[in-house]
Amino acid sequence: MTDVALIDAGGANLGSVRYALERLGVDARLVRDAAGLQGAQRVILPGVGAAPEAMSRLRAQGLVEPLRELQVPLIGICLGMQLLFEHSEEGDVECLGLLPGIVRHMTPALGIRIPHMGWNQLVPMRDSALLAGLPERASAYFVHGYAAPVTADTVAACDHGGLFTAVVQNGLRCGAQFHPERSAETGARILRNFLEMSFP
């Protein structure tokens, strides 16, 4: 993979995602405007924080429409994945609308703490090259208080007081709710799969 664009949307995990890519032998270039997307073969949208601020930053950078029109594979990570959906309850904000569904606040319950923090098991829902090479009952590291619903696009779910989307794919649009850069071999494998897999 010769040209990977890493969008700087102000997420605190930007540096750790970049380092995770470096461990895979990928020198991703930081993108802060639409011109930076030119020539990219893969685009990564990381994010930590709140959806309204992240969408405001993408708008200020002139990246909202270019991301909506992108014709190369894109993966959103953590908040970046949530931004791929139509809408988020967090701040009642319109998102990129690349995937159907509304991101909703997770509901606390007896024994269920919100935000969801820590390791949790992935529950495969359908075949996707994103999961290639993962062992059964693979786990990943999550930190989030909002979650996307399980839809026909869900590749893997996770259960924390109810199922939510952990890995998603619709054509060129992919996402991981967990932090691949903090998820050891599981995270490295999914990042590598995204970079190397063939897309329809």
UniProtKB/Swiss-Prot annotation:
Enzyme Commission no: 4.3.2.10, 3.5.1.2
GO molecular function terms attached to this record: glutaminase activity; imidazoleglycerol-phosphate synthase activity; lyase activity
SUPFAM superfamilies xref list: Class I glutamine amidotransferase-like
Single biological process term from Gene Ontology: L-histidine biosynthetic process
Domain Glutamine amidotransferase type-1: 3-200
Taxonomic superkingdom: Bacteria
Pathway: Amino-acid biosynthesis; L-histidine biosynthesis; L-histidine from 5-phospho-alpha-D-ribose 1-diphosphate: step 5/9
Keywords: Amino-acid biosynthesis, Cytoplasm, Glutamine amidotransferase, Histidine biosynthesis, Hydrolase, Lyase
Keyword Nucleus assigned: no
Claim: Amino-acid biosynthesis is one of the keywords in the record: yes
A Pfam family it matches: GATase
Gene Ontology cellular component list: cytoplasm
Assembly notes: Heterodimer of HisH and HisF.
HAMAP family from the UniProt entry: HisH (MF_00278)
Protein name (database record): Imidazole glycerol phosphate synthase subunit HisH
Species per Swiss-Prot/TrEMBL record: Xanthomonas axonopodis pv. citri (strain 306)
